[in-house]
């Protein structure tokens, strides 16, 4: 078992069970919102680790975009190893937890499937990570002496935070819509292939049945009596 490498939050690490981080595995760039799409082979399980501070909010949303049944097993565990969420054969889910200090683990399990691989999308939304409090402290040193202004820096800060929150929510909705669109497109393509296959089967059956019927009708009118000389 190799050594585990942990990066400062909110960088996310990819691992495969047995719980060993893949050598050279790339992490996410620091961001409060991160999304990732990956392919989980049949009979495999993939786990991710997310370091979190105290009293922050961790929201995980996942969807199965492609694969037979569009289902997966999901497991979320606390830094102490306590199971927080365990779902079986689900196509999507949303879970929010108030965090404590430590590394949260969440896994996607496809071991129940022996043939079909799954394409999985998930998104992390991290709130109350401490950056906002630090930003407010940075702004406070510019507030002194601004009472003469028509608009105080507190008002500007409030407007900026409101715009930031709405832009973040808009980006989150767009990401989810792209995931839904990808899953619907995969379902439509699968249905298209299935309809074409069975249409060809029906066509072949119809041709064979028609040929048999023609042969049987023709045989009814044939004179099989032998003429005497």
UniProtKB/Swiss-Prot annotation:
One of the GO biological process terms: Golgi ribbon formation
Entry GO CC: cis-Golgi network; endoplasmic reticulum exit site; endoplasmic reticulum membrane; endoplasmic reticulum-Golgi intermediate compartment; endoplasmic reticulum-Golgi intermediate compartment membrane
Compartment list: Endoplasmic reticulum membrane; Golgi apparatus, cis-Golgi network membrane; Endoplasmic reticulum-Golgi intermediate compartment membrane
SUPFAM superfamilies recorded: Supernatant protein factor (SPF), C-terminal domain (SSF101576)
Predominant cellular place of this UniProt entry's protein: endoplasmic reticulum
Record key words, sorted: Endoplasmic reticulum, Golgi apparatus, Membrane, Protein transport, Signal, Transmembrane, Transmembrane helix, Transport
Cytoplasmic side of membrane: 218-229
TM spans (from-to): 197-217
Domain called GOLD: residue spans: 45-126
Residues in the signal sequence: 1-27
Record-linked InterPro entries: Emp24-like, GOLD_dom, GOLD_dom_sf
Ranges in the topological domain labelled Lumenal: 28-196
Entry keyword Transport: yes
Function: Potential role in vesicular protein trafficking, mainly in the early secretory pathway. Required for the maintenance of the Golgi apparatus; involved in protein exchange between Golgi stacks during assembly. Probably not required for COPI-vesicle-mediated retrograde transport.
Similarity comment: family membership: Belongs to the EMP24/GP25L family.
Subunit details: Interacts with TMED9 and TMED10.
Protein name as catalogued: Transmembrane emp24 domain-containing protein 5
